[in-house]
Amino acid sequence: MSRSGTWDMDGLRADGGAAGAAPASSSSSVAAPGQCRGFLSAPVFAGTHSGRAAAAAAAAAAAAAAASSFAYPGTSERTGSSSSSSSSAVIATRPEAPVAKECPAPAAAATAAAPPGAPALGYGYHFGNGYYSCRMSHGVGLQQNALKSSPHASLGGFPVEKYMDVSGLASSSVPTNEVPARAKEVSFYQGYTSPYQHVPGYIDMVSTFGSGEPRHEAYISMEGYQSWTLANGWNSQVYCAKDQPQGSHFWKSSFPGDVALNQPDMCVYRRGRKKRVPYTKLQLKELENEYAINKFINKDKRRRISAATNLSERQVTIWFQNRRVKDKKIVSKLKDTVS
């Protein structure tokens, strides 16, 4: 059997030093009774060491195990046997890995108690298409005892188990040097315990249309404004409407209804119907003469009347329609009076 296979078999036994077979090489070491070695890493063989060096190595391993709050079985026996041993070959202990990156066994996680002074907790959450991991200090209201005792622990009114995986929080610990940097990584919005971090590069805008009432302005009033140029590089300028001709058009609202603009004062808007413009006496005389000849007009007659009265063809057509309705009303009133 090879040297590595012998050490693996000795590491699997509970009492590897007493019942284990001796290595094939002459430079093999003697394991203490009750000692359990890790079989995942090959042992490191050293040369002739003094008893003082062996005791120092064992003390360093015990201190590392005590700092990580997880003692491997056989640590005390290894310390005692190494201090009194003077053999030529000494097994160097494997350096401890960071505790925050190791996942303890399920049995050890269930039985081992959490350290009382654990500075922060680690958790992960899904946001969008990615998975983010954060660390949260105990100052935001989340404690290990509350998580272990109550399955419905809440954070600011929201269930913790819905947003975080709290299965491994009891046995996990974080180095103390990561607390100041990690505590600021967690930020909650409205409804959580602490407000979000303010970003100075953005401006908090306040909504001005909070009442829910729609704006019914038909036109935009620019009275009192001077001509100005936009700061974004636009070359066009905006002037008051008083300086523009009558043919200029304005922005209109999307609300239905007949809305007209008062021409003398272009900057002041008003609602309602367009002001009625009465026809002149000459226009009415020409229209009445044509109506006396024929109550209905054709296309040629409409064009001729429009040219004579300086009215549009649509105005001529509407006037003839209204004139026929007026005759019907007069006839109906006469019938009512006679009857």
Swiss-Prot record:
Residues annotated as coiled-coil are: none
Indicate the impact reported for residue 321 to R: Changes the function in transcription regulation
* Gene Ontology cellular-component annotations: nucleoplasm; nucleus
- Which Pfam families does its entry note? Homeodomain (PF00046), HoxA13_N (PF12284)
Query: Where in or outside the cell?
Result: Nucleus
Q: Where is the composition biased (Low complexity)?
A: 20-33
The feature table lists the DNA-binding region at 272-331
Alphabetically sorted, this entry's keywords are:
Developmental protein, DNA-binding, Homeobox, Nucleus, Transcription, Transcription regulation
Recorded GO MF terms: chromatin binding; cis-regulatory region sequence-specific DNA binding; DNA binding; DNA-binding transcription activator activity, RNA polymerase II-specific; DNA-binding transcription factor activity; RNA polymerase II cis-regulatory region sequence-specific DNA binding
Q: Where is this region: Disordered?
A: 1-33
Read off the InterPro entries from this record.
AP_axis_regulatory_Homeobox, HD, Homeobox_CS, Homeodomain-like_sf, HoxA13_N
Keyword Electron transport appears in the UniProt entry:
no
Q: What is its main location?
A: nucleus
Quote the SMART domains the UniProt record gives. HOX
The record, for SUPFAM superfamilies, names: Homeodomain-like (SSF46689)
The reply to whether NADP figures as a keyword in the UniProt entry is no
GO BP term, example: transcription by RNA polymerase II
Q: What does this protein do?
A: Sequence-specific transcription factor that binds gene promoters and activates their transcription. Part of a developmental regulatory system that provides cells with specific positional identities on the anterior-posterior axis.
Q: Which family does it belong to?
A: Belongs to the Abd-B homeobox family.
* Entry protein name: Homeobox protein Hox-D13
Gene symbol here is Hoxd13
